[in-house]
């Protein structure tokens, strides 16, 4: 495990150097940066980042956000929101995804000396990827089950997750992946169930994304409907690498798939992303 200091917070990072068979050294392709779900971490991705890096011929970087995995915890995670010595403490604010996308992720990309990475985001990580791509240069943006707005089905499932954490085995299962499981769970659950978060909506932000975009949504996702990707504004954009051709943004509806395409439909998800990125440097 490696830890890097980003704006005074130690974040867990993992470098994936997988390459296709027979390839030596760098491929020169933009690296993948993996952005995990609301209860995720480096470890919860398991070996899928390695699978995708191998399939695409790209190196990858995986990191755990503050309060997740082995990264620093958030002090007083259920207390009043505050800023102490330049760091946020207490409950997450409704703009926590914006903060991660526009402050933390740019600093991490700079620290790792990455240039125009390909973002691969799942759930909350998908929202972060979209927000980051709306303001910062990326080679492409791949999102799985992103949240672009709040739906009733999302709130219902997050309430059920709270019950499972307090009275079921969810806490025990999550504890395998997080140094501070209470911090990991409550920072996510509290903000999502707050009244202030109901107005979360990033559809307008998505209009300024200039990079190729691939969005996937499972039809059986209990945290969101197909609207989450259908309402991402999609345009036909000129391919900067080939001025006479175009890369279309793509939306995929995945059958027999829940909230985690990379786990529920691993082979298909990996194939779709690899094919999409084949035209991206």
Question: Which residues are covered by each model-predicted region?
Answer:
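Short alpha-helix in the alpha/beta-hydrolase fold that links the catalytic acid
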Residues: 211, 225-235
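Conserved hydrolase catalytic core segment
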Residues: 115-151
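Acidic catalytic loop of the alpha/beta-hydrolase fold
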Residues: 219-224
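Catalytic histidine-centered segment of alpha/beta-hydrolase-like enzymes
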Residues: 257-270
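Conserved HGGG/HGGXW glycine-rich cap/lid loop of the alpha/beta-hydrolase fold
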Residues: 18-76
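Short beta-strand/loop motif that positions the catalytic acidic residue
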Residues: 209, 215-217
């Amino acid at each position: 495990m490696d830890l890097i200091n980003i704006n005074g917070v130690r974040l867990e990072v993992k470098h994936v150097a997988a390459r296709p068979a027979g390839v030596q050294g760098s491929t020169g392709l933009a690296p993948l940066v993996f952005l995990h779900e609301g209860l995720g971490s480096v470890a919860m991705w398991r070996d899928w980042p390695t699978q995708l890096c191998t399939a695409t011929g790209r190196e990858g970087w995986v990191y755990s956000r503050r309060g997740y995995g082995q990264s620093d915890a958030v002090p007083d995670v259920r207390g009043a929101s505050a800023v102490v010595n330049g760091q946020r403490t207490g409950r997450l604010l409704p703009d926590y995804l914006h903060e991660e996308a526009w402050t933390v992720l740019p600093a991490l990309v700079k620290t790792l000396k990455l240039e125009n990475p390909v973002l691969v985001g799942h759930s909350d990580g998908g929202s972060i990827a979209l927000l980051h791509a709306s303001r910062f240069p990326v080679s492409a943006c791949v999102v799985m089950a992103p949240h672009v707005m709040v739906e009733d089905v999302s709130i219902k499932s997050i309430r059920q997750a709270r019950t499972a954490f307090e009275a079921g085995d969810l806490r025990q299962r999550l504890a395998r992946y997080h140094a501070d499981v209470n911090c990991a769970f409550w920072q996510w659950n509290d903000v999502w169930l707050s009244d202030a978060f109901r107005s979360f909506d990033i559809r307008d932000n998505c209009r300024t994304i200039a990079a190729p975009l691939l969005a996937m949504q499972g039809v059986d996702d209990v945290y969101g409907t197909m609207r989450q990707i259908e309402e991402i504004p999609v345009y036909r954009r000129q391919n900067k690498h080939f001025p006479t051709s175009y890369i279309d943004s793509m939306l995929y509806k995945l059958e027999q798939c829940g909230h985690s395409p990379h786990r529920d439909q691993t082979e298909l998800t990996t194939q779709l992303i690899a094919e999409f990125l084949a035209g991206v440097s």
